[in-house]
């Protein structure tokens, strides 16, 4: 695990150095201009996003309401322009789990620092003359967690689609993907006495998930925003299939020296979650340096 963290640290330091050096070669834009461009999901601006999530849980299990988790994630986005208004996106999502509850025969246990399950999407986005944006691609999730109790049971893969509309005041949109399990042993069933919020995914999973989002531009590079993510697990037990939050927050684009940085804080409240155990409150803080593209 220490080797994984060291490797990730080296990669992040290299990316940060690239960001600072490349930034000097770009004609500077105002923070307000950058904020409006970043509201466009088909933007050609590169970002190195670090979402930090703190989640509090609830449910029918004993002590469920005393559980919490914390993670630091990394999601780079360096769009590749293919033609005017058309871009290719390759976006990995790498979670580092600082604390995460699991449930077994002895009740809840907190797991320490671990690499989580990495996911990624590859998609092509197009901006139409009507300022409508469509993005179509594929999503995949991988069982990479270094703790077996946090590791999903199989690789999942499937299509994704996003539709958004740009306005003078901001943007709204929604993304949906569906992932099927494509690996794992169907005879290797999970222990009924074991429960992990990280997965709770049966063999050969079938999960529909997505995100709805909105951005309202304000003065001085401030924005009202929300980007909650939801999921529907088709093969979970009744009462444990749907997870859905409502959320809102703020963005602020500012500059540290010559480096623009997008700062975000959001609160999500889960109006639907698995009955035994699921998220109830979530605070997301995100730090996202804005970087020039290397191509």
Where are these regions (language model features)?
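Cleavable N-terminal export/targeting peptides
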Residues: 1-35, 295
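Transmembrane beta-barrel domains of Gram-negative outer membranes and organellar outer membranes
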Residues: 24-295
């Amino acid at each position: 695990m220490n080797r994984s963290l060291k490797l990730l640290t080296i990669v992040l330091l290299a990316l940060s150095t690239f960001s600072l050096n490349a930034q000097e070669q770009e004609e500077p834009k105002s923070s307000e201009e950058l904020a409006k461009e970043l509201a466009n999901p088909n933007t050609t601006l590169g970002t190195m996003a670090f979402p930090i999530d703190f989640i509090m849980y609830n449910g029918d299990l004993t002590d469920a309401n005393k559980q919490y988790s914390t993670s630091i994630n990394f999601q780079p986005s360096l769009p590749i322009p293919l033609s005017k208004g058309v871009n290719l996106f390759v976006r990995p999502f790498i979670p580092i789990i600082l604390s995460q509850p699991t449930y077994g025969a002895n009740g809840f246990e907190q797991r320490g620092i671990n690499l989580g399950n990495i996911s990624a999407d590859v998609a092509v986005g197009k901006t139409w003359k009507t300022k409508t944006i469509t993005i179509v691609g594929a999503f995949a999730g991988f069982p990479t967690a270094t703790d077996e109790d946090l590791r999903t049971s199989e690789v999942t893969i499937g299509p994704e689609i996003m539709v958004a509309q740009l306005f003078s005041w901001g943007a709204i949109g929604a993304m949906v993907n569906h992932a099927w399990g494509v690996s794992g042993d169907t005879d290797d069933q999970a222990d009924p006495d074991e429960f992990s919020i990280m997965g709770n995914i049966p063999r050969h999973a079938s999960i529909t998930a997505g995100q709805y989002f909105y951005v309202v531009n304000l003065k001085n590079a401030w924005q009202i925003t929300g980007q909650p993510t939801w999921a529907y697990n088709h093969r979970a037990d009744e009462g444990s299939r749907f997870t859905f939050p409502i959320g809102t927050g703020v963005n602020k684009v500012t500059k540290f020296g010559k480096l623009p940085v997008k700062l975000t804080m959001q609160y999500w409240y889960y109006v639907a979650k698995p009955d035994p155990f699921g998220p109830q409150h979530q605070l997301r803080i995100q730090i996202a340096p804005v970087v020039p593209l290397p191509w």
